Amino acid sequence: MHSHNVAKPAMYGRHWATAGAVSLLSLVFVLNGCAVGPDFVKPEADIHENWSEKDDSRVATKTAVDSQWWRAFNDPTFDKLIKLAYQQNLPLQITGLRILEARARLGIAIGRQFPQQQDIFGSATKVGVSENGANKAFLNQDFSDYQVGFDAVWELDFWGKFRRDVQAAHASLIASEADYDDALVSLTAEVALTYTVIRTLEERIELTRENVKLQEEGLKIAESRFSNGITTELDVTQARALLESTRASIPTLQSGLRQAQNALSTLLGQPPGAIQTLLDGQNGIPTAPEEVAISVPAELLRRRPDIRSAELSAAAQCARIGIAKADLYPAFSLFGEIGFQSSNNGGVQSNNAHFDNLFDASSFFYSFGPQVQWQFFNYGRIENNVRVQDARFQQLIVNYKNTVLRAAQESEDALIGFLKAQEATAFVQNSVHAAHRSVEIALVQYREGAVDYQRVLDTQRALLQEEIRLTDTRSSIATNLIALYKALGGGWELRQGQPVISESMQAEMRKRTYWGRLLPPPSPKPENLSPVPVRDIPVLKKPYW
């Protein structure tokens, strides 16, 4: 409860307080560029100028990655799935909401630049005084006290603490935007990979069924020769064993296919089975182009969202070192209080004071002036907090460098995988042609009695094995190209000009909470991807209401 039973300050005291407050406030604005703590400098990254496979004729260099790289596969179903995933994927929507959360946190940081305490207060108190208490002769035994007013305390940003807080919050905001882009890159790649798995399993099931027909033909030949007494029953049992083994692989493949379809449904924000009509038709394994155009390795530093996020997270933590260091210095504040008070607790002569004269001119009071607070004796708490923040910053610097190295590795691995899968596919295709011919020859020779049935079994097994290898290597071409585009940071441009939160979700949120101008959140812009230097942050930044 506020109590104001002291005399009003003398004139010279008011002048001193006013002059001190104005001088202190003026000094803070003059020292706008003053901020303790280190300024963030982008870490050096060890990355080569060119790819290891730069001399391969299938690799072309260009300044940017295709923003819609999946269209290179010329598969309309592919395009539809990517679009639906962008619109409906639930984890991506969560990442978009984190951008909104980060914008609100930036608003909190900006709000701290203004008076940190601004309270309207009021009270009406009835007090009964003990007749046996001290000073009872000077107080009414029963008295009332009424007061209402406004007070404020403004800690001035003398050491840049609040500007560093804004700087950290802004870096965290654009880091959350980079995280959204990274989630979008991962989503497009995951949809593409899952779709490729589905088409690969469909083809393997079809190949297995064709081999079942071929093995059924071999079984009929063995049964005919056995019934005519030409061979023993062993040929029949061997043929039947291979046939049943091949048939048994189909349910396993079908199970894997259904699981992949369910995984794709989840990526599209749909329950299992809901996207089956989209997958109808035999589009086959996505066919990748023979050549690929990619940017130089240094472009990774700009394009890969996870690298941008790592850099911005380090920038935010660098600003937090300054916030911690500011606590080592005295905090300068301005305080002020105005209000009205009416009380009859000053003795027997004050019985006429009551609520009716609360707002009389004689009931007005005020106080204001500068103040200083310094946590001088803190037993190492503040200094160790600075050390904690610095250690976290160094961790993020190392994490940034590791992210760059990992990005380079992923790109190189995917590129070499794509090129070598193409070469392997050409060899396996020749092997499949030879395996088909071997089966034909073995069956003819078996009918003629030139070879036993074991030779037929061996050629049929080899054919199935080589056809599966061909399917897998063709799939590997597509999956390695998808991995390459993901490693290069391709696909996040899909969100440009689009809201990161759907209109229906915005409407749902507005029903619960007043969001002001934070909704709808603007789409992140490429020119807003760098941390803001503290010197560019004003002492008073326009607040988010």
Task: Report each predicted region and the residues it spans.
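Terminal intrinsically disordered/low-complexity segments used for targeting and assembly
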Residues: 2-3, 19-21, 29-87, 146, ...
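Bacterial N-terminal signal peptides that target proteins for export
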Residues: 3-23
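Small/polar-residue-enriched beta-strand and adjacent coil segments characteristic
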Residues: 36-43, 67-68, 74-84, 88, ...
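Charged, alpha-helical scaffolding/interaction elements associated with membrane systems
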Residues: 88-89, 228, 448
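Amphipathic alpha-helical coiled-coil segments
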Residues: 95-109, 183, 187-210, 214-217, ...
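Short, conserved phosphate-binding/catalytic loop or strand-edge motifs used
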Residues: 126, 218, 233-240
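Amphipathic alpha-helical interface segments used for oligomerization, scaffolding
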Residues: 225-231, 249-252
